[in-house]
Structure formats: C-alpha cells, structure tokens
Amino acid sequence: MLKRALLLSLVVLLVVPVVVRAQPSAAPETVGMSKERLALIGQALNGQIEAKSFPGAVVLVARKGRIAYFESFGQLDPKTGSPMTKDAIFRLYSMTKPFTSVAAMMLVEDGKLRLGDPVGMYLPQLAKLEVAVQGTDANGKPTYTVVAAERPVTVYDLLRHTSGLVYGGFTRNEYVKDLYAKNNVGWAGVTPSEQLDALAKAPLARQPGTAWEYSLSTDVVGRVLESVSGVPLGRFLDDRLFRPLGMSDTTFHLPADKVKRLAQPLATDRATGKPIVLHDVTVAPKNDAGGAGAAGSTADYGRFVQMLANGGQLDGKRLLAATTVRHMTSDHLGDIKPAIPLLAPGYGFGLGFAVRRADGLNGLPGSAGEYNWGGAAGTGFWIDPKEQLVAVLMTQAQPGAWQREFRDLFRQLVYQAIID
C-alpha cells in the first residue's frame, strides 16, 4: 500500500506542471515611481502600434527588486487579431547573448574555463586563423592582404567582441563580407561543425584584440561551452540557468503547446512594404545559437535581469558571485575603438553587455554603470544599478536602425517616471 502511495505521489509530481514563482510586485509609489507617469509608456506604445511600428508589445519595469509596471499592448498576432498577452513568447535574437555570456562565466567560476584561454584549446578548427588586413591602393581603393593572426583569439576576445570575427551584414571589411556570404558563415541553418568549419575558412577582419566589432563571437562562445560541458548549449542553459530561475518559457525550440503564444510581426515593413520574415523558433534548430537563437517571455527575461541586478542571485538561489557580475558589467574596451558605429555614444562594452561610462555623454537618461543589450526584432533591456532599476521591452518588428525610435522613447518614459 505504501509503495502504491509513493508511486502515485511520483506520478503526480511528474504530471502536475511546475508553478513558476513570479517576481513580487509593488504599487509604483512604494518603489519611488509614479503610476501616472508610468501610464505614459502605454500611451506612447499604443501610438507606435497605430503608426505600424509593430503590432503589439509587452513591457516590464521593476525598481528596488519589485515590479512596478507590467503591461501588454496591441495584438499578439495581426493575422488573427488576437490580443497581446503578458505571457506572450518573443524571438529574442541577440538578447540570447547575455544568457551565453553568463553561462561562460559560470564555467569560469567552476574552474573549467579561463578568459585568457585560446579558443583553439576547445575548438581546434579555430586554432590557427588568418587576418584580412585592409589597405588602400594609389587610387584610394581598398586592398586586402591575408596574413597570419598575431596572436590566438581568446575566450575574453569572444565575450567582449574583439575577436576579429564579424557579422557579414555589418562589417566594413568587404573581403571578409564576401567570404562570409560565399561560405554561408552564420548562425542559422547550420550544424555546430558546419559553422566552425565555415568560420575557419574565412579570415578575421582585424587582428585579435585591436577593435570592437559586433559579431558571431557569442555563437562561438556557445560552441566553447559545448566543448567544455559535453552537452548542447540549450541543455546546459536549461540545467544551470533557465530551470534554476524558473524561466519555463525560454528555449531554442518552442514546443507545439506554446506556439499559440508566439508573438508575430506585421506582414510587411512599414517603410519598404517588403514582407517581414523572422527566425522560425517552432522548428528544431540545427544548432543552439548562443548569439541569436532563443525565444522567451517577458516575465522570464525579467527574472534573468533581476538576478543580475541582485548581484547574481534571485529568490535565495545564487547563480553567479557578485564579483563576477561586476566584472562582466564593467567596461572592458578602454581605448579600443569600435570598427562599426553600433555602440551608443558614451558606452563601452563588458563581457556580454554594453556599459555606460558616464551619466552624460548621451542624449538619453541613464547612470554610469548601467548596462544593456537588445535583439534584432525589437526586444531590449537595461539594468541601472544606481537607480536599482530594470526594464524589459518586447516587440516583434522589422530589424533595422529605425527601431531606435521606439527604444529611445521607452527609455525616456521609464526614467521620467522615477520620482525619488
């Protein structure tokens, strides 16, 4: 009888879904924010929806560890007209990168990885790389000479995007851009080995450690993590990050029972009229792309960023040391200059995040030490330790620089709602 009871109890535990504990909420005024001023966020986002920037959005603002504002606007799917819901799931694109960067620092804390390690220690394909050095001819036209890399690319280079790797669509090194296109160097539709083999065939755009260039570096960090841990990146993140934080909706492959919660973009771009096509997270990927492949909900991401804001812990569970979080969110560029104009004025870059260097030097509000990142389809977050503030914005929109319009508006309205 006892055995039967124990068996039934086990079955119940396996069948009943785990209830994720939500972050605590608070009346805005109790955490130094104005309810009336926060309401301006909704007015502004509804204006963006009417202007066809995106069909819907979910936003979360927390201060002093408690949620002051968590709202949804517009439509989840413009084809069906279904309303946006707070539990909607979004393609995160580059907001995947902070997950992978945090996971790398977990292995550093475990003593299984060092930032100064050459990447070739873990990925032999990338042990001996070349560099396409740019020059100019007598007519001022660019020339390229392929030479050996002066030193190996390190894990540190990957995390701060000084590896010499690029994104083919961003780089100004035309020689490397052409080879990336020819050899299908990217993050989607390739296996891990295919990705690494393609990267090995293309030279770096710059000598390692000499310039900041946003790139596939974080995807390579994911391959390093797989080599060290012996498991796919998605499984490692599930075990060490997502499950411990209760991030039950964050994944590289959205299961069938959650597809109805996936937010969809407008059919066409408002500026060009061309169809908007986003990454399909409902199909099992050939690789867990640590730089762009995840999807997740606003509440999930809110828990992740609150963990960072708390110095590496949430709900009594410590995932990182506070010293590690401070190290990751410090500027690691110094005098190293960006090769492409992607970092906002007044920002450097840490180990996975853009980092604000001063209260000023930028037309938008923020504090020195604030750190942030975003995703191509209209997602973004920032953490301001000085203000004890975290903010998450989720939309699904046409990728492009034009998104700064609504991203900047959201930031401005969050800061104007602080009243203490």
Cite the ranges covered by each PLM segment:
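Short, conserved catalytic-motif segment at the N-terminal edge
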Residues: 29-92, 112-114, 128-137, 277, ...
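Boundary at the C-terminal end of the N-terminal hydrophobic targeting segment
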Residues: 20-24
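Short, well-ordered beta-strand elements
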Residues: 380-382, 388-397
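Active-site SXXK
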Residues: 39-46, 59, 65, 90-122, ...
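Short, surface-exposed loop or secondary-structure junction motifs
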Residues: 77, 124-368
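Bacterial N-terminal signal peptides
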Residues: 8-17
